[in-house]
């Protein structure tokens, strides 16, 4: 299974853990990353690297880079990817989010994000599943049983 996490997911373990949703999503993201060490393939991208490089807090950026570094496959941005991303921009996604969606579509079986707006908008056009990590992992665990 090839999994694409957007930067929201990589940031989640370092967000405010006093909120229940954030804490649960954080635990699930770490569980998914752990499974990517042996069972699944984490897909990285130039878009992920770029967005992580823009994290202003040096300590948080370094921690996020460490999590993202376990990716075993990496998507480069090319003209076709930018063209596909522009289609996602037309439905209202921000440019960087559109690039994530296009990268995931080309390289992964599922794109995971904690951004409900991306899920709502992208799932209508993308050829792979776009899910919240908690909901997706619950489905996977149920199917494994």
What positions do the PLM features span?
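Acidic, PIN/NYN-like endoribonuclease modules and their adjacent C-terminal/linker elements
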Residues: 2, 16-23, 34, 90, ...
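Short, basic, glycine/proline-bearing loop/turn elements
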Residues: 14-18, 78-89
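Short beta-strand scaffold positions
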Residues: 76, 95-98, 113
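Short, aromatic/basic amphipathic alpha-helical patches
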Residues: 58-66, 120-126
């Amino acid at each position: 299974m090839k999994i694409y996490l957007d930067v929201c997911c990589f940031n989640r373990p370092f967000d405010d853990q006093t909120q229940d949703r954030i804490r649960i999503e954080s635990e699930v993201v770490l569980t998914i990353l752990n499974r990517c060490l042996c069972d699944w393939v984490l897909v990285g991208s130039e878009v992920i690297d770029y967005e992580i490089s823009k994290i202003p807090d040096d300590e948080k950026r370094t921690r996020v880079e460490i999590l993202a570094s376990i990716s075993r496959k990496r998507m480069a941005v090319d003209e076709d990817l930018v063209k596909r991303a522009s289609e996602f921009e037309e439905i209202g996604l921000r440019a960087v989010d559109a690039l994530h969606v296009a990268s995931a579509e080309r390289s992964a079986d599922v794109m995971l994000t904690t951004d409900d707006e991306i899920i709502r908008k992208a799932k209508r056009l993308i050829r792979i599943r776009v899910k919240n990590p908690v909901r997706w992992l619950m489905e996977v665990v149920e199917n494994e049983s």
